[in-house]
């Protein structure tokens, strides 16, 4: 069977960039092989901005998560699920995909159930080190189960393929930055708080840097998040530390390329990008992540010696300053960079595409 014999694939992913960005990488790879791709999402997730921008048809169904919705949410859940499944069945009937691929998010649950009820081939991919509720359920119905991390589905068998990473980011790590290059200029620290920002990083990083001797301080670029740029600039000014602060970073590949050490959260996509780009890191997992999955994500790089783990409960100016002082050495950073690249799974997209073709081949 050739790739062109699979002509239509429906991708289900939504909510956050951690689901949508890897799914977009898969969509681009499928389209490059002549496959028609459409998307199933919800009305409020980031897919509403990113998917149309990629010139992909986006179908929206009315669906929301169950966790945190209280007793009323659970009582209404069966009716809401039935409605969402009915909407998803309409999308599938109209687009008539040969394969449905779920990568997490609210729409994947009813969409995957609709695909199973309509006897369409279904595969799922889990980006985090522990599978979310939707993917755990769908893994029991799916024809193929893929994971970025070993053990994501517990005892359920899954093929570990990693997370898709953009080509321009993966290319950065082809030659990890060595100690000789790092000695030629001031070291560079990149702080990433995500689109909403991370208040703990915005307050503690400037104060930690202030504790370092001026000669040891790196050049700093700090992405502070929406509506947090001015306040973060003030914290740096009060600490007497120079930094370039921005609300967002439009070109992540350029930002990674600039950096020698990165302080950030431990989302699944971030972990994959750090490894691919060969970037040492200090990882501060988001403490309220479901099932504490960011801490589990971080273990891949931490156990390999490519990152240091700093739980937010232990994040103080003193502890961070001590860690920075230890890591801001050319030899240390060079060793960590090599270790990070060794953890990269650069063929994740190709293996997912192959999985799509294999699932469809089995149906012939």
Swiss-Prot record:
Gene3D superfamilies: Glycogen Phosphorylase B. The keyword Isomerase does not apply. It is found in: Cell inner membrane. GO terms for biological process: carbohydrate metabolic process; cell division; cell wall organization; lipid glycosylation; peptidoglycan biosynthetic process; regulation of cell shape. Keywords: Cell cycle, Cell division, Cell inner membrane, Cell membrane, Cell shape, Cell wall biogenesis/degradation, Glycosyltransferase, Membrane, Peptidoglycan synthesis, Transferase. One of its GO terms (cellular component) is plasma membrane. UDP-N-acetyl-alpha-D-glucosamine binds at residues 16-18, 128, 166, 195, 249, 294. It is a peripheral membrane protein. It catalyses: di-trans,octa-cis-undecaprenyl diphospho-N-acetyl-alpha-D-muramoyl-L-alanyl-D-glutamyl-meso-2,6-diaminopimeloyl-D-alanyl-D-alanine + UDP-N-acetyl-alpha-D-glucosamine = di-trans,octa-cis-undecaprenyl diphospho-[N-acetyl-alpha-D-glucosaminyl-(1->4)]-N-acetyl-alpha-D-muramoyl-L-alanyl-D-glutamyl-meso-2,6-diaminopimeloyl-D-alanyl-D-alanine + UDP + H(+). Pathway: Cell wall biogenesis; peptidoglycan biosynthesis. NCBIfam families: murG. Belongs to the glycosyltransferase 28 family. MurG subfamily. Cell wall formation. Catalyzes the transfer of a GlcNAc subunit on undecaprenyl-pyrophosphoryl-MurNAc-pentapeptide (lipid intermediate I) to form undecaprenyl-pyrophosphoryl-MurNAc-(pentapeptide)GlcNAc (lipid intermediate II). This is UDP-N-acetylglucosamine--N-acetylmuramyl-(pentapeptide) pyrophosphoryl-undecaprenol N-acetylglucosamine transferase.
């Amino acid at each position: 069977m050739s790739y062109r014999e699979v002509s239509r694939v429906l991708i289900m992913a939504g909510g956050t960039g951690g689901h949508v960005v890897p799914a977009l990488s898969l969509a681009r790879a499928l389209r490059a092989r002549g496959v028609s791709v459409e998307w199933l999402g919800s009305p409020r997730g980031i897919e509403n901005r990113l998917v149309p921008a990629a010139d992909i048809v986006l179908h929206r169904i009315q669906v929301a998560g169950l966790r945190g919705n209280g007793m009323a949410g659970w009582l209404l859940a069966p009716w809401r699920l039935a409605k969402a499944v009915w909407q998803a069945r309409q999308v599938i009937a109209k687009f008539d995909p040969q394969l449905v691929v779920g990568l997490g998010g609210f729409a994947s649950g009813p969409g995957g159930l609709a695909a199973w009820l309509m006897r369409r081939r279904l595969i799922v991919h889990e980006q985090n080190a522990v599978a979310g509720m939707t993917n755990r359920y769908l893994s029991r119905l799916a024809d193929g189960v893929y994971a970025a991390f070993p053990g994501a589905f517990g005892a359920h068998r899954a093929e570990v393929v990693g997370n898709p990473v953009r080509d321009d980011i993966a290319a950065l790590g082809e030659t990890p930055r060595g100690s000789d290059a790092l000695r030629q200029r001031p070291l560079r620290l990149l702080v990433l708080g995500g689109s909403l920002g991370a208040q703990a990083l915005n307050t503690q990083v400037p104060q930690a840097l202030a504790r370092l001797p001026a000669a040891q301080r790196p050049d700093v670029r700090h992405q502070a998040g929406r509506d947090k740029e001015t306040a973060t600039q003030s914290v740096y000014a009060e600490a007497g530390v120079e930094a370039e602060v921005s609300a967002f970073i439009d070109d992540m590949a350029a930002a990674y390329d600039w950096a020698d050490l990165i302080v950030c959260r431990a989302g699944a996509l971030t972990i994959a990008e750090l490894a691919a780009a060969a970037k040492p890191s200090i990882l501060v997992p988001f403490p309220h992540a479901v099932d504490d999955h960011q801490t589990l994500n971080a273990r891949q790089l931490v156990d390999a010696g490519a990152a240091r783990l700093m739980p937010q409960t232990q994040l103080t100016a003193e502890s961070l300053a001590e860690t920075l002082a230890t890591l801001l050495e050319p030899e240390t950073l060079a060793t960590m960079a090599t270790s990070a690249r060794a953890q990269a799974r650069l063929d994740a997209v190709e293996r997912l595409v192959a999985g799509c073709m294999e699932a469809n081949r089995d149906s012939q």
